[in-house]
Curated annotation (Swiss-Prot):
GO terms for cellular component: extracellular region. It comes from Karoophasma botterkloofense (Gladiator). The keyword Secreted applies. Keywords: Neuropeptide, Secreted. FMRFamides and FMRFamide-like peptides are neuropeptides. This is Extended FMRFamide-10. Belongs to the FARP (FMRF amide related peptide) family.
């Protein structure tokens, strides 16, 4: 899976 799953970005 992509690393983006490791952190959450605020809109």
């Amino acid at each position: 899976p992509a690393p983006e799953s490791s952190f959450i970005r605020d809109p």
